[in-house]
Amino acid sequence: MIFALAGNQNCGKTTLFNALTGSNQHVGNFPGVTVDQKSGEVREHKECTVVDLPGIYSLRTYTQEEIVSRDYILNQKPDGIINIVDATNIERNMYLTLQLMELGRPMVLALNMMDEVAANGGSVRVNEMEALLGIPVVPISASRGEGIEELVEHALHAARFVETPAVHDFCSTDDHGGAVH
């Protein structure tokens, strides 16, 4: 099974890729470190391959790196998508999440950097987020290796049983002055 690691720049995709595969791909605290896709087998799950894609904010692309990600997601049709979301900035990440959900592919949301949220005295209501989105939401810390096995199990389950996200229109006509979009 093949899973695409998709998310905004600097959300921890390559750190998660390294944690999943045992690789040592270069990680940087600035956008544009990953400029092409990389793939590797998941440790302890040799039937599972993950593809680390460059950061992308939307399926409407502007940069060459974003085109690489969009084209892989749309044309290669991986068995599932692991959407990595920076838990310290969820709102910024949700635009891409909702676009990915609309594709109707098996998907799991990896809520990364939960250790930073906790260190700053914050919390995330994961169960409520999961109920609202209709997909598994797994809190992780890729840099510490926390929640990684649970994430893999959820991703495999979603792909094996073809759990596709429910299609939601998160905007009502009231949100747009009565206009339908």
Which sequence ranges carry the predicted segments?
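Long, well-ordered amphipathic alpha-helical subdomains in the mid-to-C-terminal portions
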Residues: 167-181
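Helical mechanochemical/support elements of P-loop NTPase systems and associated helical scaffolds
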Residues: 31-35, 49, 61, 65-68, ...
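Canonical P-loop GTPase G-domain recognition
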Residues: 115-169
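Active-site-adjacent beta-strand anchor residues
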Residues: 6, 83, 141
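Alpha-helical scaffold segments in soluble metabolic enzymes
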Residues: 15, 19, 68, 150, ...
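Conserved C-terminal guanine-recognition region of P-loop GTPase G domains, centered on the G4
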Residues: 40-48, 68-138
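Conserved nucleotide-binding/hydrolysis micro-motifs of P-loop NTPases
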Residues: 23, 32, 55-56, 87-91, ...
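Conserved G1/Walker A P-loop phosphate-binding module
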Residues: 1-64, 74-76, 80
